[in-house]
Swiss-Prot record:
This is DNA-directed RNA polymerase subunit beta'. HAMAP family: RNApol_bact_RpoC (MF_01322). Pfam families: RNA_pol_Rpb1_1, RNA_pol_Rpb1_2, RNA_pol_Rpb1_3, RNA_pol_Rpb1_4, RNA_pol_Rpb1_5. Binds 1 Mg(2+) ion per subunit. Its cofactor is Mg(2+); Zn(2+). Its EC number is 2.7.7.6. It is an enzyme of class 2 (transferase). DNA-dependent RNA polymerase catalyzes the transcription of DNA into RNA using the four ribonucleoside triphosphates as substrates. Keywords: DNA-directed RNA polymerase, Magnesium, Metal-binding, Nucleotidyltransferase, Transcription, Transferase, Zinc. Belongs to the RNA polymerase beta' chain family. One of its GO terms (cellular component) is DNA-directed RNA polymerase complex.
Length: 1690
């Protein structure tokens, strides 16, 4: 027999970082190709993204090639195609993987805030990004040129950048000059003058060539010199005019030196003497001097000593001008030993006088256009350029060119370049010491090359993900932990460096604890998710539509394969780098495609499709409303469901609904089939026959359906499902047609009406589900709202009007005397007979005998009232009352309280039947005549317009400002509108049967405000406005009523019955539209509010019957700014007492005289109890003198002091057992005492109690009287005071259950008025109760149509938002570690920090108002009032700690600091504000729901001093965890001595590293060492507080030094923050900031214990609430076939 059980299978879920091995182990094979499906065969490509070999077969139990088909081959791997034969479901589960050609960083760990990689490696995110994406660093630096390389590998002229130069300079000796970079040299080089060109070449200091082009403009004097002359000047020598160029000389004759022949050369003017052939002499040549004669002839033979020439004298040649000597090109000369020159033949010597000269240096590589000696004209081109753009010049070269071309080029002393950067991954320790570099330092590529040249093979640097991977692999986490801990000891705990270090330490510990390896954050392998989770679908036209993921995977595979190919080819590094960067970007895009969530643009390119739409990555699939969490895991679709339009079902019982036959057949098809099959055989043909019976709609099918439906229930749901009453169970009744029929009374909980609303039907399938639906969800048992404990399933509209019509009476009824009544009846039956026979009508006054409370009485009433009372329980009948909406609601509630839920449900059905019947009988219609306009209206309007005219005149004369004018007019019209409203109401009431009056008065539809607009006056209209406008802001600042700024001062003085004119119509449209827009804008906002509330509270369930606490909150009226927001009886209803309630006078437990109920601890308070306790007051003595007998065993049960000295105790000492002991020692048996009965009671008068002079308040309403106050009363001669008991009730706020709340602190389950059951999901109920009206708040504007005076919704919602997000409206600025509020709306409210009195309110020298408070001890406390704030107190007023002294917003953390541990005062202040917002809108919600939300908002604390925990200062930690940690520390500290003995002889499970006094890290012990006493002593001296040892193969941690507990401060969180800080990672991830939550959880290896509801829904098991509790897990529900049951019954 089938069983259904409630067992939950998953205990907890852990998340970790996947290692490459784990990813490969998940995979069914490597995806090598980017192809998906073959376009011809439509089969998946082998090794592609849809490969069957990797992911499983496309067809069930069939391999790709078709060799193996059918289930019998399951598990076989086809040898042809390699596909395993299995179910195609495998394609939803089996994963693949991609082996990356180069590592890629997981983007989540880089872009998280704070960056995980950055924190762990101690690097900034920008540096990390630069490394990973092969970025560069912009460097502005000087450049140097090598002038003398000496013994280095440099060459002369090498260019070195400053960064490299600094590195080289430390190790090598070489000379450099600073270089200048040439910019914008002007070209070509032009001659500035006419002249002659001279070219000259020379080498510069850097070994480069400079060509000098010299152009001279000259005057030239020619001087001829003759052979034999001696030149006394050199070429290029400067001479003056008249200076000798040659010597003046006499030349002797020439004689033959030996015998020989003469040869004369006339051309060269020389004589050669050749010796005789016999002689050994050599030939001699003589130049014939100018003017000498030759005495021999050519060929003549001469003897030694013969004269050959005559003597001659040569004059000197003088320079005709001053200038430079230039030898002519034809000049033939011979240098003499004395440095002069002998002229050998006639030639020219020039003297040049330079008029102008220009020099043009040209750098090597430039093209020179001229040659030596060329004549050039001014403007002629000499060279194409003198310098090249971007040329580097040494300082010397720069000077040369600067002097010759002063304005023709610019230079830069520093260059600006983007240098690729690398990170050091390995370095020799000596090199590290020498250079100061360490692993993880970032250097530019140039610097790295410089280091590499100096220290070859001793330093390694790299870029890209592989560099990050190496860094992470190099991390020694244990040593790093010891190093950080040692450094932290030296720093003040609040310093920013310490906080940064603690964050890093936490991460290190997380990695150590979770067993994750840091290098796993860099991917070697990328997992490929199953293909059915990223499907391709064929669309018309033969094309395929595919998921974005496939495109992202495709790009990744393409880039990966390209990189593999390039690596095989040995491509250059620059190409590889680019390809690796693109691969990294492809991996990024797959994981998280898009800019960072915080709005900061990432450096990554966003991958887009053809249409420019960013592709959806894995992160996008998880996060947001459409993500995996919220759409698929938390928002599953439900099978066995249908949906249809709803219509009213007037004949249904409250627990029934009408389901269309067709729909029922479809929903219950399996059950019908089972029943049909159960009777016959189950062969295939039979099955087909049965199916046909259903599909052909044969009568047998309907009969079986009727049977199947009998006794089962279905669930009806109407969207939006705002609270649990939006899903209720009903018994289905088959109906014709296509619409679901709904009982009219259950419309309010569903918020349904019949204007086209649709509802969904769900069938609970199992017996367990059916039982749960029937007993817990049946609409019959859900007529009481869990939000406020009053009925919610209530009659509306027609039913109300029917009941009202039935019980209403004519005008003359009350004045009619009994003796004048015409008709008298002995019983209701008799009266009915008379009615049916037409003698009387429903409203005819009659006298009739009826039974009231068991007695027969004769009363005056009407038949209608008799009929109506006939359906009521006997004790609730009232024959002289009109039953309108309020009365009926009260009636249903009272019936429920007295007779239970079933009777109340039956009553609702009866009221429905009677209401519909008599609404029909009433013949209710609407006509224009029913709208009675008050006759006085016109006169009132005439007078008002006259008053307006006077105001306008005063304004024009300048007596009023614009604001005053507007304000006066608005006030005037508001009072007139009010007056006309009253008149309209009065006019209508003249006829009790006026249909409009009946509708409004009965509460069936509409209100007097709408009637006023129809028949009275429309009044003032609201403007559309911008809340950010200056006008509004200034009003808020000044604390003025905003509504004046938002109101037209021109009224619509007509009503809708008469119609309005054009202008008034236009004004009306403004307000109407504003209403529509506000509603649209705020509905989504309210939905978001509900969602945050649910997220915060979803884990709060009732976890135990009683946590045992004696703490609680004080019962009181909630008063906000003088307005009572909630009366004490409402506050007390549904609560459990935390302490006994004592009678103020007798101090004994209080007893209710009517019921005899005693109000002891743990008593639950009903409505009646709450009313009794709230109204219980007594006048009690302030003080009494008594003499007590101290031999008795008890002290007085009130506060008492001794009235005479006893031993060392003075008079006025509190009476305690010590005092009694002292009295007994003195031999006394009786002592005089002063008893103060008022101490511990609560002052119960609303008017404060003043002192004798009437200047100072001694007691204020609801103040708890203590002994100090009692003595003040005594001093002021006050004898008796009206007081009530001090009532402390339990509350979720003070509950001490570790998880959730206990039943006693929660109190009554408002939906059934019994103590709440363990397992009830009270958190969700609270969130729904608060959120559901939020949407109501927004939707109410509809019906008022923007009329001024209708309280604006926005205000209500904004208040709610402000309360739940208390910091969203504050601008917090940190200064010196403390948060300061700089600006709030207006100003910050000042809180009183003591109990005391307002001594004075004065102004200081600067003109600021100061409030002086005197406390009970007489100390004065001064409070300066902010400029914009209003003072809320007056002189002599009593103020209590935590009260506000000025207007403005409460700064919650300041209030929290003022109060005790529990945060109750803060919660009560929040409660007042938020209750006020809801009460104004007429919404009732029980306080306990708010308290649960506040409990969650107060569930965290900020760490002040982390002590020996892993937390960081200012970190938010759940209070539960802190308390647990501190408790464990206290227990651990007590065991230290015992542990020290226990660990001796054990084996260490981890090595132990400590810091020496010199600051060095040393290893004290290795893993596996035995713990000796000596080693333990060393460990203790090193300050190590706990060690890990092996115990039976398990690692156990022992504490060996006392630890410090955590010091903390309670925090009030906003809803969003409370939800995000939820301890379970699954729920937090599903809320918001999914990626960050998962990242943090994975690093920690966080375990989600699945405590809350959301987590369990996500993992797909029963929630740990209600029937899902472990208590019920063992229950098995047997599914008994109905036939068997029927047999048994028969």
């Amino acid at each position: 027999m089938p069983m259904s059980s409630f067992k939950r299978k998953i205990k907890a879920i852990q998340i970790k970082i996947a290692s490459p091995e784990v990813i490969r182990s998940w995979s069914g094979g490597e995806v090598k190709k980017p192809e998906t499906i073959n376009y011809r065969t439509f089969k998946p490509e082998r090794d592609g993204l849809f490969c069957e070999r990797i992911f499983g077969p496309v067809k069930d139990y069939e391999c790709a090639c078709g060799k193996y088909k059918g289930k019998k081959y399951e598990g076989t791997v086809c040898e042809r195609c390699g596909v395993r034969v299995e179910s195609r479901e495998a394609r939803r589960k089996r994963m693949g993987h991609i082996e990356l050609a180069a590592p890629a960083v997981h983007i989540w760990y880089l872009e998280s805030i704070p960056s995980v990689l950055g924190t762990l490696l101690n690097m900034s995110t920008s540096d990390l990004e630069n490394i990973i994406y092969y970025g560069s660093r912009r460097v502005i630096e000087r450049v140097f040129i090598v002038t003398d390389p000496k013994d280095t590998p440099f060459s002369q002229g090498d260019v070195i950048y400053e960064t490299e130069y600094r590195i080289y300079r430390k190790k090598w000796d070489f000379d450099v000059e600073q270089a200048f970079v040439v910019k914008n040299p002007k070209s070509p080089v032009l001659s500035d003058i006419d002249g002659e060109v001279t070219l000259k070449t020379e080498k510069s200091i850097t070994g480069r060539e400079i060509t000098w082009i010299i152009v001279k403009n000259i005057t030239r004097a020619t001087h001829t010199v003759l052979p034999g002359m001696i030149l006394v000047v050199k070429d290029g020598q400067e001479v003056e005019k008249g200076q000798d160029l040659t010597k003046e000389m006499t030349i002797d004759p020439v004689y033959a030196p030996f015998d020989g022949h003469v040869e004369i050369d006339e051309l060269s003017n020389t004589i050669t003497l050749k010796p005789l052939t016999t002689s050994k002499d050599q030939p001699v040549v003589f130049t014939v001097p100018y003017g000498a004669k030759i005495l021999v002839s050519n060929g003549q033979k001469v003897k030694k000593g013969d004269q050959i020439t005559t003597s001659t004298s040569l004059p000197s040649v003088k320079s005709s001008i001053s200038g430079t000597v230039r030898f002519g090109s034809n000049l033939n000369i011979r240098a003499l030993e004395d440095g002069n020159f002998e002229v050998l033949s006639t030639g020219e010597v020039y003297v040049e006088q330079v008029i102008e000269e220009r020099k043009y240096p040209v750098f090597e590589g430039a093209l020179v256009y001229v040659n030596n000696g060329d004549q050039v004209k001014k403007g002629d081109h000499l060279a194409d350029r003198f310098l090249f753009e971007e040329e580097y010049l040494s300082a010397t070269e720069y000077k040369i060119f600067e002097s010759h071309y002063p304005t023709m080029f610019d230079v830069e002393e520093r260059t600006e370049n983007d240098r690729p950067i690398v990170v050091i991954t390995d370095i020799d320790p000596e090199v590290s010491k020498e250079t100061g570099l360490k692993v993880g330092d970032i250097v530019t590529e140039n610097e790295y090359e410089a280091y590499l040249q100096i220290y070859p093979e001793k330093i390694v640097a790299d870029a890209g993900a592989q560099a990050i991977k190496k860094l992470l692999q190099n991390l020694d986490l244990e040593a790093l932990q010891a190093e950080i801990e040692a450094e932290l000891k030296k720093l003040p705990s609040s310093s920013s460096k310490a906080i940064k270090l603690r964050r890093r330490l936490k991460m290190v510990k997380d990695f150590l604890k979770s067993g994750n390896k840091p290098e796993w954050m860099v991917l070697e392998v990328v997992p490929v998710i199953p293909p059915d989770l990223r499907p391709m679908i064929q669309i018309e036209g033969g094309r395929f539509a595919t998921t974005d993921l496939n495109e992202l995977y495709r790009r990744l595979i393409n880039r990966n394969n390209r990189l593999k190919k390039l690596l095989e080819l040995g491509a250059p590094e620059i190409i590889l780098r680019n390809e690796k960067r693109m691969l990294q970007e492809a991996v990024d895009a797959l994981i998280h495609n898009g800019s960072d969530s915080e709005g900061k643009r990432s450096r990554r390119a966003v991958l887009k499709d053809r249409n420019g739409r960013p592709l959806k990555s894995l992160t996008d699939l998880l996060k947001g409303k459409k993500g995996r969490f919220r759409r698929n895991l938390l928002g599953k679709r439900v099978d066995y469901s249908g949906r249809a339009v709803i219509v009213v079902g007037p004949n249904l019982k409250i627990h029934q609904c009408g389901i269309p036959k067709k729909m029922a057949m479809e929903l219950f098809k399996p059950f019908v089939l089972a029943k049909l099959l159960g009777e016959g055989s189950s062969s295939k043909t039979m099955r087909k026959v049965k199916k046909a019976i259903i599909e052909k709609e044969m009568p047998e099918a309907w009969e079986v359906l009727e049977e199947v439906i009998k006794g089962s229930v279905v669930l009806l749901n109407r969207a939006p499902t705002l609270h649990r009453m939006s899903i209720q169970a009903f018994e289905p009744k088959l109906v014709e047609g296509n619409a679901i029929q709904l009982h009219p009374v259950v419309c309010p909980p569903f918020n349904a009406d019949f204007d086209g609303d649709q509802m969904a039907v769900h069938v609970p399938l199992s017996a367990a589900a059916q039982a749960e639906a029937r007993f817990l969800m049946l609409s019959r048992y859900n007529i009481i709202s869990p939000a406020h404990g009053k009925p919610i399933s209530l009659p509306t509209q027609d039913i109300i009007i029917g009941s009202y019509y039935l019980t209403t009476v004519g005008k003359e009824f009350d004045s009619l005397k009994e003796e004048d009544v015409k008709w008298k009846f002995s019983s209701p039956e008799e009266a009915m007979l008379a009615y049916h026979l037409g003698f009387i009508k429903l409203h005819t006054p009659i006298l009739i005998k009826v039974v009231i409370n068991g007695e027969e009485k004769r009363i005056k009433t009407t038949l209608g009232r008799v009929i109506f009372n006939g359906i009521l329980p006997e004790d609730l009948r009232d024959y002289n009352r009109i039953f309108d909406k309020k009365q009926i609601n009260a009636l249903v509630y009272e019936t429920f309280k007295r007779h239970g839920i079933d009777r109340a449900a039956d009553l609702l059905d009866d009221i429905k039947d009677i209401g519909f019947h008599y609404a029909t009988v009433s013949g209710l219609t609407l006509s224009l005549k029913d709208l009675k306009i008050p006759p006085e209206r016109d006169e009132i309007l005439r007078k008002t317009w006259e008053k307006v005219r006077i105001i306008e005149e005063n304004y024009e004369k300048g007596f009023l400002t614009e604001e005053q004018r507007k304000s006066e007019i608005i006030r005037l019209w508001m009072s007139v509108t009010e007056e006309i409203t009253k008149l309209t109401s009065k006019t209508l009431a003249e006829d009790p049967f006026n249909p409009i009056y009946m509708m409004v008065n009965s509460g069936a539809r509409g209100n007097i405000d709408q009637v006023k607009q129809l028949a009275g006056i429309r009044g003032l209209m609201i403007k559309a406005y911008d809340p950010r406008s200056r006008e509004i802001k200034s009003k808020i600042f000044k604390g003025q009523a905003i509504h004046e700024a938002l109101t037209f001062d021109y009224p619509v003085d007509k009503n809708l019955r008469e119609g309005v004119d054009i202008l008034q119509f236009f004004i009306s449209t403004y307000g109407a539209r504003k209403g529509q827009v506000d509603t649209a804008m705020n509905t989504s906002f309210a939905g978001y509010l509900t969602r945050r509330l649910v997220d915060v509270a979803q884990s709060v369930t009732v976890s135990e019957p009683d946590c045992g606490t004696h703490e609680g909150i004080r019962a009181m009226d909630l008063i906000k700014e003088g307005t009572v927001v909630e009366k004490m009886n409402e506050f007390l209803f549904g609560r459990v007492l935390a302490r006994d309630v004592l009678d103020p006078e007798t101090k004994e437990v209080l007893k209710n005289p009517e019921t005899g109920k005693e109000y002891t601890r743990n008593t639950m308070l009903t409505d009646d109890d709450a009313n009794f306790l709230a109204s219980y007051k007594k006048m009690v003595d302030v003080v009494r003198y008594e003499e007590i007998d101290i031999t008795e065993l008890s002290l007085p049960n009130m506060y008492a002091e001794i009235a005479e000295p006893v031993g060392e105790y003075e008079e006025g000492t509190e009476l305690t057992w010590d005092v009694v002991k002292a009295a007994k020692n003195e031999g006394k048996y009786r002592i005089k005492v002063k008893v103060y009965p008022v101490v511990g009671t609560v002052y119960a008068e609303e008017e404060p109690l003043y002192d004798k002079k009437g200047e100072r308040q001694l007691l204020v309403y609801q103040e708890v009287i203590n002994e100090i106050v009692a003595k003040m009363l005594e001093e002021n001669g006050i004898e008796k005071v009206p007081v009530r008991p001090d009532i402390i009730v339990r509350s979720p706020l003070t509950c001490e259950s570790e998880y959730g709340v206990c039943a006693a602190c929660y109190g009554m389950d408002l939906s059934n008025h019994k103590i709440v059951n363990v397992g009830e999901a009270v958190g969700i109920v609270a969130a729904q109760s608060i959120g559901e009206p939020g949407t109501q708040l927004t939707m109410r504007t509809f019906h008022v149509g923007g009329v001024m005076g209708a309280s604006d919704i926005v205000s209500g919602l904004t208040t709610v938002e402000k309360t739940f997000e208390p910091y969203a409206f504050l601008r917090e600025e940190k200064s010196g570690g403390k948060k300061e509020i700089r600006k709030y709306y207006g100003s910050e409210a000042i809180l009183c920090e003591v109990d005391g009195f307002v001594k004075d309110i004065a102004t200081d020298e600067s003109g600021r108002t100061v409030i002086y408070i005197e406390d009970y001890a007489g100390n004065i406390h001064a409070y300066k009032v902010p400029k914009r704030a209003k003072v809320r107190v007056e002189k002599g007023q009593k103020v209590l700690r935590g009260e506000t002294l000025t207007s403005g917003a409460i700064v919650w953390w300041k209030l929290l600091e003022l109060e005790s541990e529990k945060g109750v005062m803060t919660a009560m202040n929040l409660l007042k504000i938020i209750k006020n917002a809801y009460v104004q809108q007429g919404v009732s919600i029980h306080d306990k729901h708010f308290e649960i939300i506040f409990k969650q908002m107060l569930s965290m604390a900020t760490i002040v001093d982390p002590g020996d925990s892993d937390y960081l200062p200012d970190q938010l930690v759940p209070l539960v965890d802190i308390k647990r940690f501190n408790r464990e520390i206290l227990e651990g500290n007590a065991k230290v001595e015992e542990n020290r003995k226990w660990v001796i002889g054990k084996t260490l499970a981890k090595r132990i590293i400590a810091e020496t006094e010199e600051g060095e890290l040393v290893e004290l012990a290795q893993k596996g060492d035995e713990v000796t006493e000596e080693l333990l002593k060393k460990i203790i001296e090193a300050g190590i507080k706990e060690i890990d040892v092996f115990e039976k193969d398990k690692v156990v941690t022992y504490q060996i030094l006392p630890k410090e507990p955590i010091k903390y401060k309670r925090r009030l969180l906003s809803l969003k923050k409370a939800a995000l800080n939820y301890p379970g990672w699954l729920s937090a991830a599903a809320f918001e900031e999914t990626a960050w939550v998962l990242t943090a959880a994975a690093i920690e290896g966080k375990v989600d214990p699945l405590i809350g509801l959301k987590e369990n829904v996500i993992v797909g098991q029963l929630i740990p609430a209600g029937t899902g509790l472990d208590v019920f897990a063992g229950i098995q529900v047997e599914e008994t076939p109905r036939a068997a049951v029927e047999e048994e019954l028969a």
